[in-house]
Amino acid sequence: MIQNHLFQILANLAMEPPPRTDSESIRDEKVKVLKAIPPLDQKNIVRGQFRGYQNEKGVAQDSKMETFAALQLEIDSWRWKGVPFYIRAGKCLPVTCAEIVVRLRQPPTMYQGFNLTRNDFRLRLSPEVTLAFGMNVIAPDRITSANARKW
């Protein structure tokens, strides 16, 4: 799943606007994204197997087949420089879903020195399509604190 579906979603999310809306222009922009991913460092890759997988019907008792993979990568471009992308996929996880979570850069410390969390947005593609936002909220009359909110 990581090598096809999730990279396709990553390319769609991170590509620059194509000069035209024909399929070749869109494909070219996606290819630019994929080519801008530097080689992965082993310390940014996690692989595993869910407990009990070797007891599944048709699975060898000594199977080393991964049922989970997670990786952190970056895209070497002006827009995404320094923004980590996390891709995870696996079987038998606590939540069954396909989603994209984008954590935006840390806000500047211009808001009266508040220790602000990073804003994010979440696009869940399955089991149902939802869009959620997590952001810092500073009420006009509150000058001493900020609250992280999720919608």
Language-model features and meaning:
Residues 1-151:
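Secretory/organelle targeting and membrane-embedding segments
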